[in-house]
């Protein structure tokens, strides 16, 4: 089976969030099920620089405001997977963030940039590459939301059955919304600008295009698949998603064991397994404390946070509850960037308590590994969370997740309640209500369990034994493909 994945990010070449981890890990995981995957990405500088030995597949005349368009074919570095790169310098050759300028303002022509990506995917689905034609095109998030629309438009124009399409929602909150006036520049049939198409409350929605026109829809956890059919988390699309519930699947993301594996992670102070976690994690904690300037205290409970600093991630709760950690002798290590007010609030907390709170603004993949290995608890107090990868990394590294019971967090972490401790299923700490009080109680329970060393080690062992690799997810995705082909 031949499948084309369409996305805007791919780890380790370009990453702004978990999307990149998923698009990198899924194609090789699908290979074990006989799926021949290829990937299509925009020609952002990161891709153009990292991908070598590119072969020119075709030159396309000016389109979507791009003066020059070249489609290259190459291998993803250090893999056997083929990748198509859409090189359109006037649209993609911009420094920094792939979606926004240096002031963090979204590029005004993002609709053209990602329309081109979707349009090229449709051309590949029709045989643009004479040597390889996909049977399924799988697009990821709003950046690739127009892919099913362009493929459906081609089917309507030609009268020929098009390839099948799958669209994955990684985060429904980011919808790719643009003024209605841009539709005229998208080269789509006029009938697509309607309630049964791209129109969304007087705007054009790339996310809605994917949800409406794809043959199958997946999202990244079973709980999130249910939540997005409700008013609270449907972001205005709950009606469409409820109508399409028979085509909607929640498939939990996995962890790539080649990247996240405490037994062989070269980025951490000491490697360890389930049986050697006590010694290994102690070494990683000491190294983390030294690196971040925290007080060297073996018995301090270290809470790690690796996240975007946004209200969605529950950081407004954490800034209010952080005193609960430090007053009990705990320490906090935070890595992330985002909302300026939150950045300043955490920096101020670190300045006030430099031996208890360490904050690094920005994203550093190596430091993320060190924080997750060296912490005792990984905090993920998100208001909503489609899947979440950080808690899965925490489980893998024996760093107990403390999470809000929502989305994929609810599906992957089992609370250390008395009954769960008794039957050996506990893997972390879960709080139900999105409030400072509920988060604070969960923090107190983490301290209480840490003081019962035997129980802590038991929960850590259970956490590290959880199956969180990509095999189960790839199996389910392959089953969805098989329904279509």
Curated annotation (Swiss-Prot):
Pathway connected to this protein: Glycan biosynthesis; glycogen biosynthesis
Origin superkingdom: Bacteria
Enzyme class: transferase
UniProt GO BP: glycogen biosynthetic process
Keywords: Glycogen biosynthesis, Glycosyltransferase, Transferase
GO CC aspect terms: cytosol
Transferase found in the keyword field: yes
Reaction equation(s) it catalyzes: [(1->4)-alpha-D-glucosyl](n) + ADP-alpha-D-glucose = [(1->4)-alpha-D-glucosyl](n+1) + ADP + H(+)
A UniProt-annotated Pfam family: Glyco_transf_5
InterPro entries listed in its UniProt record: Glyco_trans_1, GS/SS, Starch_synth_cat_dom
Residues annotated as binding ADP-alpha-D-glucose: 15
GO molecular function list: alpha-1,4-glucan glucosyltransferase (ADP-glucose donor) activity; alpha-1,4-glucan glucosyltransferase (UDP-glucose donor) activity
SUPFAM superfamilies attached to this UniProt entry: UDP-Glycosyltransferase/glycogen phosphorylase
EC number, as in UniProt: 2.4.1.21
Role summary: Synthesizes alpha-1,4-glucan chains using ADP-glucose.
Family recorded in the similarity comment: Belongs to the glycosyltransferase 1 family. Bacterial/plant glycogen synthase subfamily.
HAMAP family: Glycogen_synth
UniProt-recorded name of the protein: Glycogen synthase
Gene: glgA
